[in-house]
Amino acid sequence: MNAKEMRGKEAAELKQELESLLRAHFALRMQVATQQSNKTADLGKLRRDIARVKTIMREKAGQA
């Protein structure tokens, strides 16, 4: 999902998306740590998605 699509969402939806991304990031970190997965590039993608959601949430909070 790109930033333009995220800006159209409500704050509650963004919070739910953030929780989902954080859970996925944790699960992938554990898989990499236990060598069940070697998709380390996906960790970076998830980190950037989390930052993107947090940025948009902060923008919306500043506008309100």
Swiss-Prot record:
GO terms for cellular component: cytosolic large ribosomal subunit. PROSITE patterns: RIBOSOMAL_L29. This is Large ribosomal subunit protein uL29. GO terms for biological process: translation. SUPFAM superfamilies: Ribosomal protein L29 (L29p). It comes from the Bacteria. Keywords: Ribonucleoprotein, Ribosomal protein. It holds the Pfam family Ribosomal_L29. Signal peptide: none annotated. The keyword Ribonucleoprotein applies. Transmembrane segments: none annotated. One of its GO terms (molecular function) is structural constituent of ribosome. The keyword Ribosomal protein applies. Belongs to the universal ribosomal protein uL29 family.
